[in-house]
């Protein structure tokens, strides 16, 4: 973190610098003009994590500033949503005089939504007892007069949910509202308003699609649920069980009837498609019945592994969302042999950092 860089008056210049850097890095692929999707310059992060410093009777949040090489007190935090900032102040006021709730508390995580829900996770270097549970329940009751809040307590090999361990986000995407269950400690897009722009862009570039869609690394179904309207059927894979469970919830709550989620890794699915291995998880699913002309990939920072990359190259159209331009560039070295980049986008999920989220549509040459 570099707090000094978080200056809204410099946001436009920083975003322009990112665009130029991205264009230069990918010039060899003869990409079309970069479509740039800006963030709000402040209060854009829907989640935030803070360490907690104890100093006598005082108690405050802090982060580590890599430039100053020191901890920095954070009573408020410009990148975090307005809801998180409101909760930060209300929560610390409650925690300071309460020995049971503050004792050996070392971290607080916040997960908020545009729909107004917020989840607070309190992390401790001690085991939590009935006294903690009682005090936490009373805290939740008091905070509930101002917030739609849930509280979780965590310690080594211990997790206490006072009510539920998730929030439900509602995103207005074009003329539709999609609802997404977001589970504590699982991946979610941190910048909700930019996430909406990503969904709208993905819907736009896949308009008038033929056949079915295959998605790898689908998470909680964020993209596949929104894209289902553009395809006959959608087949999606995800390995993490909490994400698969959330995806099934999201499919039901959004009334999606043409989306099938399979719990398996991209590598396993590649083997299944190549008939190298059989999986019990695929019983009752006729892979050969799917006519997937388009594949959607949103891989981790490491990019796509070689075997899966070969699978991806077999599709007419490839929609690739990347959180790491370096591994995207490496993957494009291979994909560019058979496919051409026809759409190219920069999504500024993380203002005031070097991080660049990109979207690429490739079509067979």
UniProtKB/Swiss-Prot annotation:
Give the function comment from the record: Dual-specificity methyltransferase that catalyzes the formation of 5-methyluridine at position 54 (m5U54) in all tRNAs, and that of position 341 (m5U341) in tmRNA (transfer-mRNA).
Chain sites annotated for binding S-adenosyl-L-methionine: 189, 217, 222, 238, 298
The family database entries (InterPro entries) matched by this protein are listed as:
MeTrfase_TrmA_AS, MeTrfase_TrmA_CS, SAM-dependent_MTases_sf, TrmA_MeTrfase, U5_MeTrfase_fam
Catalysed transformations (reactions): uridine(54) in tRNA + S-adenosyl-L-methionine = 5-methyluridine(54) in tRNA + S-adenosyl-L-homocysteine + H(+); uridine(341) in tmRNA + S-adenosyl-L-methionine = 5-methyluridine(341) in tmRNA + S-adenosyl-L-homocysteine + H(+)
Coiled coil, from the record = none
Q: Which NCBIfam families match?
A: trmA_only
UniProt-recorded name of the protein: tRNA/tmRNA (uracil-C(5))-methyltransferase
Q: Which UniProt key words apply to this protein?
A: Methyltransferase, S-adenosyl-L-methionine, Transferase, tRNA processing
Q: Which domain of life is it from?
A: Bacteria
Which of the seven top EC classes does this enzyme belong to?
transferase
Gene name? trmA
State the family named in the UniProt similarity comment for this chain.
Belongs to the class I-like SAM-binding methyltransferase superfamily. RNA M5U methyltransferase family. TrmA subfamily.
> Which Gene Ontology BP terms does the record give?
tRNA methylation
One MF term in GO for this entry?
Answer: rRNA binding
Q: EC annotation?
A: 2.1.1.-, 2.1.1.35
The active site lies at 323 (nucleophile), 357 (proton acceptor)
Entry-linked CDD domains? AdoMet_MTases
């Amino acid at each position: 973190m570099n707090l000094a860089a978080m200056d809204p008056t410099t946001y436009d210049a920083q975003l322009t610098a990112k665009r130029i850097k991205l264009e230069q890095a990918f010039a060899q692929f003869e990409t079309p003009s970069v479509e740039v999707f800006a963030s709000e310059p402040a209060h854009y992060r829907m989640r935030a994590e803070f360490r907690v410093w104890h100093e006598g009777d005082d108690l405050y949040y802090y982060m580590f500033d890599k430039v100053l090489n020191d901890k920095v007190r954070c009573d408020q935090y410009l990148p975090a949503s307005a809801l998180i900032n409101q909760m930060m102040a209300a929560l610390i006021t409650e925690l300071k005089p309460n020995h049971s709730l503050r004792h050996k508390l070392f971290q607080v995580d916040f997960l908020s939504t545009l729909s107004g829900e917020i989840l607070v996770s309190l992390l401790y270097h001690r085991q939590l007892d009935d006294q903690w549970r009682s005090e936490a329940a009373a805290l939740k009751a008091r905070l509930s007069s101002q917030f739609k809040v849930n509280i979780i307590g965590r310690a080594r090999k211990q997790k206490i949910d006072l009510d539920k361990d998730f929030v439900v986000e509602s995103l207005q995407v074009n003329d539709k509202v999609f609802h997404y269950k977001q589970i504590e400690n699982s991946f979610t897009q941190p910048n909700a308003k930019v996430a909406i722009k990503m969904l709208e862009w993905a819907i736009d570039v896949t308009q008038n699609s033929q056949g079915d869609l295959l998605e790898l690394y689908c998470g909680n179904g964020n993209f596949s649920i929104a894209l289902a309207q553009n395809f006959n059927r959608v087949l999606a894979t995800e390995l993490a069980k909490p994400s698969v469970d959330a995806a099934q919830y999201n499919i039901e709550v959004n009334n999606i009837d043409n989306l099938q989620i399979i719990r398996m890794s991209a590598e396993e699915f590649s083997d299944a498609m190549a008939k190298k291995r059989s999986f019990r998880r695929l019983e009752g699913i006729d892979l050969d019945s799917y006519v997937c002309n388009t594949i959607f990939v949103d891989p981790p920072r490491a990019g796509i592994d070689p075997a899966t990359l070969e699978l991806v190259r077999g599709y007419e159209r490839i929609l690739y969302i990347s959180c790491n331009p370096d591994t995207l560039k490496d993957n494009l070295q291979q994909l560019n042999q058979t496919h051409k980049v026809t759409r190219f986008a920069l999504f500024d999920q993380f203002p005031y950092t070097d991080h660049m989220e990109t979207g690429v549509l490739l079509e067979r040459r």
